């Protein structure tokens, strides 16, 4: 039997000074892009020296292949410098540095990968709640992935690592290709066990090839494997031994078990108590026997390690022990007792990065609990499906309360599902109500993926059916564990020619499509999500446009005159170029208005020039690098001059605007918003999409645009892929319009470009649709488009602290906003711009409270009495009969809050705010009951994007127009500059959406 202190020499000739390696424990502490942090270097340096080798945790080989946040990357050459520092820190004390390389495959959560749908051998989701169904990799993608692994090995060598460990375990991509559960292919990469070994073998071959190219005969190559899978069908131990024999034949330095205990027995047949290492030694081939094998799991003290070697392992891998005992190897070899727990005050001393420290409890796996979990899954998969026949109604939790679901059962089958969605929001939820029931019926399983963009509604349907199953005497837990069928995958390619293709089904895309249809063009609109709507359907519906004749019928509010007087006093040096001429025109207009006020004419003023100047000043910002930005004049001039054109066009298309009130959205600076009578943005989506259908326009959902087709600098078409893998190749006679939105749901992309905010938290919430991940910007940039303003991102100050959503709680007009901090004090002009408000929120702790009374509650247009009552019960809104009681409930000083409200009410009476200069006042806070809505900034709008001209033509990096390519909406930059006014987003999408449709139709 080998001893812990014995050296070991690998086939490559590399020698380790003992039989201990530090296991590749994920510490989740890399930069947002996967770069090495100093915390990581310190962590590994503190643990090196004693062990023969340190295996550094999973490094993703492709940008969208992360399995967890804070993952380490080796996907680009830019990572080499940081990895070099890491390797040097490990090797400086005598340990060999080995880097584990992997791709998560279907385990790549879109949340950690910019919203990108995961990939795998086949479109089969993992057996876990809400698992995303992956895209099946094409043959070309498989070859590219093998090259990516080779590139990763090359970078590891350049960074100075002594070897790599190929991560073929933990249900990640390499294991997925070997697994009969996740690999249902019938080509050279799958179909039988022999072909399922092809991908792991190809990765090994590529690894060896790269090492040979560097003349690195002494480069360590290891392979980590999970011996079994619980899934049906899944990897069994005999299968694993077949794979290991193939790998060993090609030459390896070691195999590395991946399991929670070195003494673990089978998870497939737990009644068989024989340890897997014993089975391994009995079944090993001659080739496998020559490769050292590492045992892992449950090795806390020297005795554990020695027992593992005695059981048959050649080496031991220590994970959790090294977390709390950085010198574990030295202590174990000196027969000292190793710590098994860390004191709460030891984080700094142990050099444990904060992300790891915060999740260490969750990283310590309870082996007994894991065994029970596996046994439970196995039992549930064998439970017979039986019901008490009949019709049962149960409920799930939807957006607006309980969602009734009526399910009809036979004795062994779900026969029918009827969802009563009458109280749910239109548009965005519809696919969930149609698709989820059908998928349940087709598969007779509750193991169903939620619909992208309709997560809450999807879960409500699933929960409703689950509850109905239990009412009918069935076992909903068993149905949730029942394997889902593989997606019927298509290798079909559809090729056709149309006049125009529009990418994105939000307001900009629908406007462009309808405009082109009006001009007699054939148009196809592609939407990657199951439902159209994008961010537009999530808005409050406010559309800015200066309409002085209409606005002049409304009285001026207290504070508005003061706002205009301050604006008129702005130094002319603040204005650049043609904006100065507009400012001079505006000052003359204001002189006339002030005269009218003196003569008793108390009306609301507005003009196109005021809208333009406020858009300019509202967007004029300087970033952290001292770079200033403001809206490109001709783009802003076009937007503000043609805004009423857009309002009239929308009215013509059936939008019924409420002319009884003129409103000011959050951060709008002025009352000029037009709003439909039907609440929220769904009115625009509903009416415009119906017009498109009436004119035989084609809207294709579940279809993701991937690449523009460019010929001699001109865009001549676009490629896309549908949810079932069908490829679309669409040639265009006129052009392609990109209207796919910004990247507000892609935190990594925001952090990559950010130059404005001091910090963007990894867990910051967003008001955006999860579809908005910047793919349209990436597609355009690949075709040569110039990007502008990418460093600026707008935060919505009044986001929901839990979800990031905008339209929860009491969202009232800003003239009725009253913000207080945790000291119960006001701290800002509540009518200020969004970035100013967000910064003020951060300066006051991030979370603040919006205070309202019963009268102000009645002005909330985002909600209903029923929703308010529900949100009070849930704690989204806090209600009290007195201000004193409200202060107690939200934890602010009672006297401060009552004084603050008294002072605010005095400002309303006086029509001016000496301390914060609030620009408009509405109602006082005086009628019980009183309300507080907690709010916190969330990502709302990304300011940068593709550069366009006033014809919505995309501009290339050479400054020239890219023929055949147009863009509109948040996918573009240059209009709003550093900050967008509330209400300007919708007028932007409808104005430039129409312009894009016009230009593409007319071949401008």
Curated annotation (Swiss-Prot):
**Needs which cofactor?**
FAD; FMN
**What pH-related activity note exists for this entry?**
Optimum pH is 6.5-7.0.
* Reactions catalysed: acrylate + NADH + H(+) = propanoate + NAD(+)
Cofactor info, note text: Binds 1 FAD per subunit. Binds 2 FMN prosthetic groups per subunit. 1 FMN is bound covalently, while the other is non-covalent.
Per its UniProt entry, what is the enzyme's top EC class, as one word? oxidoreductase
An example GO CC term for this entry is: membrane
The protein's matches in PANTHER family, at most eight in alphabetical order, are given as: FAD-DEPENDENT OXIDOREDUCTASE 2 FAD BINDING DOMAIN-CONTAINING PROTEIN, FUMARATE REDUCTASE
What's the domain remark here?
Consists of three domains. The first domain of ARD (Oxidored_FMN, PF00724) carries a non-covalently bound FMN and is used for NADH oxidation. The second, FMN_bind domain (PF04205) contains a covalently bound FMN, that acts as an electron carrier between the two other domains of ARD. The C-terminal FAD_binding_2 domain contains a non-covalently bound FAD and forms a site for acrylate reduction.
Q: What is this protein called?
A: NADH:acrylate oxidoreductase
- The gene designation is ard
């Amino acid at each position: 039997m080998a001893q812990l202190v014995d050296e070991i020499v690998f086939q490559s000739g590399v020698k380790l000074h003992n039989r201990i390696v530090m296991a590749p424990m994920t510490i989740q502490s890399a930069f947002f892009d996967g770069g090495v942090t100093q915390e990581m270097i310190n962590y590994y340096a503190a643990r090196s020296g004693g062990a023969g080798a340190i295996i550094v945790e999973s490094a993703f080989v492709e940008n969208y292949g992360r399995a967890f946040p804070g993952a380490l990357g080796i996907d680009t050459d830019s990572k080499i410098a940081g990895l070099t520092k890491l390797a040097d820190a490990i090797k400086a004390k005598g340990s060999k540095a080995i880097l584990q390389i992997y791709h998560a495959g279907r385990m790549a959560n879109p949340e950690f990968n910019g919203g990108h749908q995961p990939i795998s051998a086949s479109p089969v989701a993992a057996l876990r709640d809400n698992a995303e169904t992956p895209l099946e990799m094409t043959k070309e993608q498989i070859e590219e992935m093998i090259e990516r692994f080779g590139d990763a090995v090359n970078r590891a060598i350049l960074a100075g690592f002594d070897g790599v460990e190929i991560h073929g375990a933990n249900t990640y991509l390499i294991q997925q290709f070997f697994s009969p559960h996740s690999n249902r292919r019938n080509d050279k990469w799958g179909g039988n066990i022999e072909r399922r070994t092809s991908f792991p073998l190809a990765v090994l071959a590529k690894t060896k090839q790269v090492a040979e190219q560097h003349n690195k005969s002494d480069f360590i190559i290891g392979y980590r494997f999970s011996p079994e899978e619980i899934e049906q069908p899944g990897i069994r131990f005999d299968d694993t031994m077949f794979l290991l024999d193939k790998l060993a034949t090609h030459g390896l330095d070691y195999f590395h078990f991946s399991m929670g205990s070195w003494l673990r027995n089978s998870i497939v047949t737990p009644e068989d108590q024989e340890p897997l290492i014993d089975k391994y030694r009995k079944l090993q081939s001659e080739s496998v026997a020559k490769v050292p094998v590492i045992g892992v799991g449950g090795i806390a003290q020297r005795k554990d390690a020695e027992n593992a070697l005695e059981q048959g392992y050649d080496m031991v891998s220590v994970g959790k022990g090294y977390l709390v005992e950085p010198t574990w190897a030295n202590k174990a070899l000196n027969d000292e007792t190793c710590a098994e727990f860390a004191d709460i005050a030891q984080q700094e001393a142990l050099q444990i990065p904060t992300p790891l420290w915060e999740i260490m409890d969750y990283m310590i796996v309870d082996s007994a609990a894991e065994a029970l979990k596996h046994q439970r899954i196995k039992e549930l998969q064998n439970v017979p499906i039986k019901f008490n026949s009949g019709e049962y109604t149960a409920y799930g939790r939807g957006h607006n309360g309980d969602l009734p679901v009526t399910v009809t059962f036979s004795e062994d089958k779900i026969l029918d599902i009827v969802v009563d969605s009458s109280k749910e929001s239109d548009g965005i939820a519809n696919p969930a109500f149609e698709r989820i029931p059908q998928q349940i019926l087709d598969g007779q399983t509750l193991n169903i993926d939620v619909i992208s963009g309709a997560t809450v509604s999807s879960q409500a349907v699933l929960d409703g059916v689950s509850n109905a199953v239990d009412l009918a005497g069935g076992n909903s837990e068993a149905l949730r564990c029942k394997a889902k069928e593989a997606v019927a995958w298509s290798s079909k390619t559809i090729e056709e020619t149309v006049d125009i293709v529009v990418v994105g089904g939000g307001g900009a895309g629908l406007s462009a499509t309808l405009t082109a249809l009006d001009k007699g063009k054939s148009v196809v609109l592609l939407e990657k999500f199951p439902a159209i709507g994008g961010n537009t359907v999530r808005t409050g519906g406010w559309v800015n446009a200066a309409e002085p004749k209409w606005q002049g019928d409304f009285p001026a509010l207290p504070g508005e005159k003061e706002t205009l007087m301050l604006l008129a006093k702005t130094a002319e040096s603040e204005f650049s170029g043609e904006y100065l001429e507009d400012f001079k025109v505006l000052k003359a207009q204001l002189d006339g208005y002030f005269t009218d006020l003196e003569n008793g004419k108390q009306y609301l003023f507005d003009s196109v020039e005021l809208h333009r100047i406020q858009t300019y000043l509202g967007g004029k910002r300087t970033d952290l690098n001292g770079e200033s930005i403001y809206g490109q004049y001709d783009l802003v001039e076009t937007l503000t001059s043609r805004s009423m054109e857009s309002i009239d066009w929308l009215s013509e298309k059936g939008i019924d605007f409420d002319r009884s009130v003129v409103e000011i959205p959050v951060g709008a600076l002025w009352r000029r918003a037009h709003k439909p009578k039907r609440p929220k943005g769904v009115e625009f989506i509903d009416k415009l999409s119906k017009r498109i259908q009436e004119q035989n326009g084609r809207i294709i959902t579940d279809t993701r645009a991937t690449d523009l087709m460019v010929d001699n600098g001109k865009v001549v078409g676009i490629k896309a892929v549908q949810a079932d893998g069908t490829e679309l190749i669409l040639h265009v006679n006129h052009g392609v319009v990109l209207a796919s939105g910004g990247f507000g749901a892609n935190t990594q992309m925001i952090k990559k470009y950010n130059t404005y905010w001091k910090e963007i938290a990894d867990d910051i919430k967003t008001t955006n649709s999860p579809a908005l991940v910047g793919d349209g910007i990436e597609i355009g940039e690949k075709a040569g488009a110039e990007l502008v303003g990418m460093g600026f991102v707008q935060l919505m100050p009044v986001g929901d602290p839990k979800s990031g959503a905008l339209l929860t709680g009491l969202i009232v007009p800003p003239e009725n906003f009253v913000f207080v901090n945790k000291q119960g004090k006001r701290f800002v002009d509540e009518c200020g711009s969004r970035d100013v408000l967000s910064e003020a929120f951060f300066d006051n702790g991030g979370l603040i409270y919006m205070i309202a009374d019963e009268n102000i509650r009645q002005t909330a247009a985002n909600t209903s009495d029923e929703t308010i009552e529900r949100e009070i019960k849930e704690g989204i809104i806090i209600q009290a009969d007195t201000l004193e009681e409200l202060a107690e409930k939200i934890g602010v000083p009672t006297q401060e809050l009552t004084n603050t409200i008294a002072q605010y009410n005095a400002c309303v009476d006086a029509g001016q705010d000496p301390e914060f200069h609030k620009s408009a006042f509405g109602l006082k806070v005086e009628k019980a009951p009183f309300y507080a809505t907690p709010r916190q900034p969330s990502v709302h709008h990304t300011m940068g994007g593709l550069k366009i001209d006033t014809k919505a033509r995309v501009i290339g990096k050479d400054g020239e127009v890219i023929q055949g390519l147009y863009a509109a909406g948040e996918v573009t930059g240059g209009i709003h500059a550093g900050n967008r006014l509330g209400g300007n987003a919708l007028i932007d999408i409808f104005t430039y959406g129409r312009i894009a449709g016009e230009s593409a139709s007319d071949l401008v």
